[in-house]
């Protein structure tokens, strides 16, 4: 096979970029589907890719995606186990020691309901309709330390336990129209324009608390502040008295009432038949929440003896009060009602607002050993409500027997370096069946893994004249 030599400077720059990416990345979930050369859904990661298909179609089961990231919560850290490996004792101190100062939990899910790709001449048009759920929470270790060590470990105003949380949850529909073209034999570009309809949104604007014990009197002093905003379906609303209700009417029209817009853009450049590079940006956009918005706030109220200068000050109970609480149900309920008055949640209608999508950036380098085997290195990062989260992945993808695609990946994530993934895609006539995960260990220990991604689907690749991605000249066939 005739080979075209790339300029030496191109290769040096590509290798240098990948080395810098490896040195700076920490991690976020990546799916082996993104690297599968025979899987049409690789376009989700790289809209500029030149697929070797004339048409692609899927309905309901084309792509089902579940993604979990959990930096520190572990089942094994919560318990002490007996000789048979069964949980015997809850060890809160051990659990608290296993936490980081800042911890993260993320949950993302996607379900493609309809997909259609159609090639006209050398250009590819795409259409996707699906539902996405994105959620992430960043939280401190303060609450777990308080449970594990007790308030006696936090003596003095200068040594409080700090409890913080940043929560973001969003669900929406996505209707996307895309276009891919080969500008030259070396350069391909692609993109998608997305019409979005928000279903649900919850976001914290402030959520923190501080507690310490006075070293002389052992009184507990607590300060807290909570502020959240949300957009809910009509089934959830705030009534005239300010109470949150969940018995409102619901109609299908509510699924189309919070409009938004987003775009994906990508470019792929082939230095020669072996080296190529990809740059992409996904989910650059927003959703306008204009219906049934509400706010939630919680600040300490002056409800009596335990209120002191904006703080909840608990100096203890005398024996008579303790006896009444333990033996008198009416007194106990009255006491608890009084405590609740200090920490009342207030709901109120909220004006219209916008939220940005979780924008994702991607840089990838590919090396094709031959027309059946590819090695890739990828740096990826996502702007979440709780901050920026990067990722680094190396991948191998092999094609066998013209109808079997196997992909192996390794991904680095924050506080986790054991994410070995595997994906298999099989062609049966025009039917492409695939199953992937980015963490094989997570399949066997889901309660003790730092991250897990699973994707499964069945896609129909129609009118495929040639299954080889690269022809005898070493150039992708649709570039001729």
Predicted regions span which residues?
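Repeated loop/turn-to-beta-strand initiation elements of outer-membrane beta-barrel proteins
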Residues: 55-57, 123-125, 186-189, 274-277, ...
């Amino acid at each position: 096979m005739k080979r075209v030599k790339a300029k030496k400077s191109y290769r040096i720059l590509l290798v240098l970029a990948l080395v810098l990416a490896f040195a700076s990345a920490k991690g976020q979930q990546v799916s082996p589907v993104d690297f599968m050369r025979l899987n049409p859904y690789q376009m989700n990661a790289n809209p500029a890719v030149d697929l070797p298909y004339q048409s692609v179609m899927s309905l309901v089961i084309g792509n089902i995606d579940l993604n979990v990231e959990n930096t520190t919560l572990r089942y094994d850290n919560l318990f002490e186990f007996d000789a048979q490996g069964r949980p015997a004792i809850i060890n809160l101190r051990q659990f608290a020691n296993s936490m980081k100062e800042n911890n993260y939990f993320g949950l993302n899910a996607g379900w493609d309901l309809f997909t259609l790709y159609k090639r006209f001449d050398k250009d590819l048009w795409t259409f996707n309709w699906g539902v996405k759920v994105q959620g992430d929470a960043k939280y401190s270790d303060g609450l777990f330390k308080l449970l594990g060590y007790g308030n006696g470990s936090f003596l003095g105003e200068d040594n409080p336990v700090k409890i913080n949380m940043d929560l973001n949850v969003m669900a929406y529909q996505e209707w996307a129209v895309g276009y891919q073209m080969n500008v030259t034999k070396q350069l391909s570009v692609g993109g998608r324009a997305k019409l979005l309809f928000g279903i649900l949104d919850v976001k914290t604007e402030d959520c923190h608390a501080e507690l310490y014990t006075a070293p002389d009197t052992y009184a507990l002093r607590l300060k807290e502040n909570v502020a959240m905003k949300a957009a809910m379906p009509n089934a959830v609303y705030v009534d005239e008295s300010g109470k949150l209700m969940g018995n409102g009417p619901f109609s299908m029209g509510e699924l189309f009432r919070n409009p938004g817009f987003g775009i994906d853009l990508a470019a792929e450049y082939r230095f020669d038949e072996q080296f190529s590079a990809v740059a992409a940006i996904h989910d650059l956009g927003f959703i306008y929440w204009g219906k049934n918005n509400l706010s939630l706030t919680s600040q300490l109220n002056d409800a009596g003896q335990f209120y002191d200068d904006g703080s909840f000050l608990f100096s203890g109970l005398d024996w008579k009060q303790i006896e009444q609480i333990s033996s008198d149900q009416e007194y106990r309920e009255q006491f608890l009602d009084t405590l609740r008055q200090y920490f009342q949640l207030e709901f109120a209608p909220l004006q219209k607002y916008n939220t940005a999508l979780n924008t994702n950036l991607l840089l990838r380098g590919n090396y094709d050993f031959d027309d059946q085997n590819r090695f890739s290195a990828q740096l990826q990062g996502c702007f979440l409500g709780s901050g920026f989260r990067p990722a680094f992945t190396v991948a191998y993808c092999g094609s066998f027997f013209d109808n079997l695609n196997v992909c192996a990946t390794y991904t680095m994530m924050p506080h986790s370096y054991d994410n070995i993934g595997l994906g298999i895609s099989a062609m049966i006539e025009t039917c492409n069946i695939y199953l992937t995960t980015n963490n094989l260990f997570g399949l066997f220990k889901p309660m003790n893994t730092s991250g897990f991604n699973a994707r499964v689907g069945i896609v129909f690749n129609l009118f495929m004249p040639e299954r080889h991605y690269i022809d005898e000249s070493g150039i992708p066939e649709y570039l001729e």
